[in-house]
């Protein structure tokens, strides 16, 4: 559909469609168009055209979220103001996911952890390993990042993992890390690290409840798989 969005039939305009049918009725490109706001008068391209080009050039929302403002500005019609609006909207989405997790009183299932962390990790190209510290009633005390980059036993050392747990008087911990490849299948290194940390936790009286690997749209729980 050509021409400015204002010239389109009302039912096809992203803003009117959202108000009438709800945000879920809109495509990713239409939601981006609302954030972008205006098109490019010099080329006659609408905000929706620009949104579609962004998704195509970056290969989807995941890569767009990882792009810098300057990279977004390379799209014709997307200047610094539009790039800033897009980065702000994506950051708000990330913060919303984080707040939902922080409001949880206690850990009840691996899927809870996945629901939070897949939003946070999906844009990362590196592996991140962190721990969730829990009290005796499985209430979340704190999250602690242990390492960034490829996992190995020299980086994910029991001393680093349990240092904060001891300081916070944690009764248990949950291990969490991501696989940037998107496949949550554990490597031999993942399995060995989990065994080593579980043994160290037993000696310290701090139970390792689970190790959850976050993939792209899926996760693996060591406990659910009977691996610990």
UniProtKB/Swiss-Prot annotation:
GO terms for molecular function: metal ion binding; metallopeptidase activity. Residues 106-228 form the MPN domain. One of its GO terms (biological process) is proteolysis. The keyword Hydrolase applies. CDD domains: MPN_DUF2466. InterPro entries: MPN, RadC_JAB, RuvA_2-like, UPF0758, UPF0758_N. Zn(2+) binds at residues 177, 179, 190. A motif (JAMM motif) lies at residues 177-190. Keywords: Hydrolase, Metal-binding, Metalloprotease, Protease, Zinc. It comes from the Bacteria. Belongs to the UPF0758 family. This is UPF0758 protein Gura_4138. It comes from Geotalea uraniireducens (strain Rf4) (Geobacter uraniireducens).
């Amino acid at each position: 559909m050509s021409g400015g969005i204002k010239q389109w039939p009302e039912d096809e305009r992203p803003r009117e469609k959202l108000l009438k049918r709800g945000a879920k009725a809109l495509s990713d490109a239409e939601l981006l168009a609302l954030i972008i706001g205006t098109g490019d008068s010099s080329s006659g391209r609408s905000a929706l055209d620009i949104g579609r080009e962004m998704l195509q050039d970056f290969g989807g929302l995941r890569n767009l979220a990882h792009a810098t403002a300057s990279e977004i500005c390379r799209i014709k019609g997307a200047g610094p103001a539009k790039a800033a609006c897009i980065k702000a909207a994506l950051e708000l989405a990330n913060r919303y996911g984080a707040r939902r997790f922080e409001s949880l009183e206690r850990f009840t299932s691996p899927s809870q952890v996945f629901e939070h962390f897949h939003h946070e990790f999906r844009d990362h190209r590196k592996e991140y390993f962190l721990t969730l510290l829990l009290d005796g009633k499985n209430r979340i005390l704190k999250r602690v990042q242990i390492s960034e980059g490829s996992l190995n036993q020299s980086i994910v050392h029991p001393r680093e993992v349990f240092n904060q747990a001891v300081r916070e008087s944690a009764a248990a911990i949950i291990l969490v890390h991501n696989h940037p490849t998107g496949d949550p299948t554990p490597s031999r290194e993942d399995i060995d690290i989990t065994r080593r940390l579980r043994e160290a936790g037993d000696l310290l009286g701090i139970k390792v409840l689970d190790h959850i690997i976050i993939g792209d749209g899926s996760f693996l729980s060591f406990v659910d798989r009977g691996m610990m």
